[in-house]
């Protein structure tokens, strides 16, 4: 099974981590589109174009069987069009884990950390409207501009990152939030900082494990055998620090810079 995974940067490697725990026989091709990061500050039209170009690259260069959009923002902007354009390709998107958050919260106060684009996206708004209509909960939504850049630059432990998180999380701490949805695949990389600032153990909802389970189920349904070697090739569209990659995924089979052809679809 050949699987293409992409994100605007390194955050999607948290999804690859989850895949590696349950998927055995798969060749994973990961594209970090660092040239255009962060997606959360781009227009939906731009994000759709990036997503179409990367998908075409995966199909032309690596003949993938499965595409995983390891980015909430790109899922919102592109998954519908990609499924229409490539009906034979298995496509798995990433959505904020509102449903599991509703199942796990005790205080009925839920925080959502996400990029600005995800919070205003139609897919997220529809999900919130449907699920919150069934449950009496209070959502504390917080856009986190600049956090992806801090993570990409290896500044997770910096004072600036701490101050940013402190400002965003203070209202949640004061309002007895016990569950926080990590609405961007980069954010699990600062999970320990979130718990430190919240000053208590939290339910932190990340969808990587759900994506891995979905892929395993689809693989079995399509007759792919879950055995053999798990291989990972990481590619980037711009310069990136491999030391940061190794902090997330210590072992991988290859790394290279690539140029994704820009096409007008």
From Swiss-Prot:
GO terms for biological process: cell wall organization; peptidoglycan biosynthetic process; regulation of cell shape. Its EC number is 5.1.1.3. The active site is at residues 71, 184. SUPFAM superfamilies: Aspartate/glutamate racemase. One of its GO terms (molecular function) is glutamate racemase activity. Gene3D superfamilies: 3.40.50.1860. Substrate binds at residues 7-8, 39-40, 72-73, 185-186. It comes from the Bacteria. InterPro entries: Asp/Glu/hydantoin_racemase, Asp/Glu_race, Asp/Glu_racemase_AS_1, Asp/Glu_racemase_AS_2, Glu_race. Pathway: Cell wall biogenesis; peptidoglycan biosynthesis. It catalyses: L-glutamate = D-glutamate. Belongs to the aspartate/glutamate racemases family. Provides the (R)-glutamate required for cell wall biosynthesis. This is Glutamate racemase. The lineage of its organism: Bacteria, Pseudomonadati, Campylobacterota, Epsilonproteobacteria, Campylobacterales. The gene is murI.
